[in-house]
Amino acid sequence: MPLTGRKIRVLVVDDSAFMRKVLKDIINSDPELEVCGEARDGIEAIEMVQKCRPDVVTLDVEMPRMNGLDALRVIMKKYPVPVIMISALTQEGAEATIKALEYGAIDFIPKPSSSISINMRELKDEIIAKIKEAAKVPRRFLELRRIRLLRVQKAKKVKPSVPARIAVAIAASTGGPQSLLKIFPKFPENLKAGILLVQHMPPGFTRSFAKRLDSVSKIDVKEAEEGDVVEEGKAYVAPGDYHMEVTLRGGKPVITLNKKPKMHGVRPAADPMMITAAQVFGRRTVGVVMTGMGRDGAQGIVEIKKRGGITIAQDEKTSIIFGMPKAAIETGMVDYVVPLEKIPETVVRAVEMIRGGGNLGRHVTIPR
């Protein structure tokens, strides 16, 4: 039972009666959750938010009369509540979902296009866990976010391809897309490191997210492919349903993708990426663990620190979900605990420290 002693109230919004029933059955099967109402479109959703005062809303992206994005804007502006988007596995669905996360949605659940009831029931544990985590999100994160991200006009000149000698390994989950979109524009074009990013997302969504990150960043961002050489000033996003690892090939750091068993219930997981990055780059590795639920990234932080690298965790105040950073900090192997807005400058300082041959002591906390 939640700390309040009452069940978590959930409003289910979907234009499909069948889909609403599947979601209601899943939610009501957990003793800590209850469905307080349902709606068929965005207009009904706004009315029901006022009537049943839910703790969490599950909101379909594509609906008649008023779609999920438009409803989300109104809900976050007038009746702030944690919202989880239910999105189709299409390019349009993925792009709309990324936009919804920018507007203030906490998380999303992919909606398979066929065998919906079978697939959604396979997702039962994930749906229940995400609803419970969303209900805990501090109110300060519940607002209509207008992230004014200007598309960056990248220089047309061809940049020289320089294999990275330093790696920045970033782990993120719930709350990650919104947070990463805030910090990636701050990385300088001439960053003397390659960035390896694992954001927990299913196939299709990672490609849309990589494109969105690229559009607002000075560095080049792409969804990672098998055999990519890790280069300076470039970021590589692990593709959905593949673990991303790093190996040495011909003296160059190369990305490999695999479908080894899920770790922490997810694929991609950050730990395989961070551990192999540490093995390849050694002390020239910077590890960053950001907002998200679970423990992914903690093992990677330990491995990076053991090999002399520099480790960073996002602080509790700016983490939408503090699970992953907390687990990393509890290893005792984190050098810097910093607010979200300080992560880019801390990474740049760490890269410069490594290039200059310096070494950070452990347990260093950058003050606000």
Swiss-Prot record:
SMART domains: REC. It is an enzyme of class 3 (hydrolase). PROSITE patterns: CHEB, RESPONSE_REGULATORY. Residues 9-126 form the Response regulatory domain. One of its GO terms (cellular component) is cytoplasm. Its EC number is 3.1.1.61, 3.5.1.44. Pfam families: CheB_methylest, Response_reg. The modification 4-aspartylphosphate is found at D60. Phosphorylated by CheA. Phosphorylation of the N-terminal regulatory domain activates the methylesterase activity. Keywords: Chemotaxis, Cytoplasm, Hydrolase, Phosphoprotein. Its main location: cytoplasm. Contains a C-terminal catalytic domain, and an N-terminal region which modulates catalytic activity. Belongs to the CheB family. Involved in chemotaxis. Part of a chemotaxis signal transduction system that modulates chemotaxis in response to various stimuli. Catalyzes the demethylation of specific methylglutamate residues introduced into the chemoreceptors (methyl-accepting chemotaxis proteins or MCP) by CheR. Also mediates the irreversible deamidation of specific glutamine residues to glutamic acid. This is Protein-glutamate methylesterase/protein-glutamine glutaminase. It comes from Pyrococcus abyssi (strain GE5 / Orsay). The gene is cheB.
